Amino acid sequence: MGRGRGKRVVRKLKLQIPGGQANPAPPVGPALGQAQVNIGEFVRQFNDATRDRMGQLIPVEITVYEDRSFTFVTKTPPAAFLLKQAAGVEKGSGEPNRSAAGRVSRAQVEEIARTKMPDLNAADVEAAVKIIEGTARSMGIKVEQ
């Protein structure tokens, strides 16, 4: 049996928006406006979908179709965002090898790895932990064993 043709994809957008706090102001409005998407509808749907992750930075992939309809997929927050939250710092170190920006425990790194598992290219949690530790190292955040 042949597969029916779906709607034609016109554009794919990737944005990072705080959970439950999307609004038509930049960067959301202009990006969606250029793609001719109903901005109000996206904002409402996104805020409903991310209400439980209020304040977290949520990467979202928006697929726009030729009839101006859209679908979106939310991802897990960036590892850097989760590490900064766990370490209680505003930003990573300007010179990661010289000065430490903060500290996180191995347990915190494992928790972040479990959260990020769906979006990481890792076979198991141990591999995911190594990826997160590498991100922490590049930000100047020390991982304590």
From Swiss-Prot:
The keyword Heme does not apply. GO terms for biological process: translation. One of its GO terms (molecular function) is structural constituent of ribosome. One of its GO terms (cellular component) is cytosolic large ribosomal subunit. Pfam families: Ribosomal_L11 (PF00298), Ribosomal_L11_N (PF03946). One or more lysine residues are methylated. SMART domains: RL11 (SM00649). Keywords: Methylation, Ribonucleoprotein, Ribosomal protein, RNA-binding, rRNA-binding. The keyword rRNA-binding applies. InterPro entries: Ribosomal_uL11, Ribosomal_uL11_bac-typ, Ribosomal_uL11_C, Ribosomal_uL11_C_sf, Ribosomal_uL11_CS, Ribosomal_uL11_N, Ribosomal_uL11_N_sf. PROSITE patterns: RIBOSOMAL_L11 (PS00359). HAMAP family: Ribosomal_uL11 (MF_00736). Part of the ribosomal stalk of the 50S ribosomal subunit. Interacts with L10 and the large rRNA to form the base of the stalk. L10 forms an elongated spine to which L12 dimers bind in a sequential fashion forming a multimeric L10(L12)X complex. Belongs to the universal ribosomal protein uL11 family. NCBIfam families: L11_bact. This is Large ribosomal subunit protein uL11. The gene is rplK.
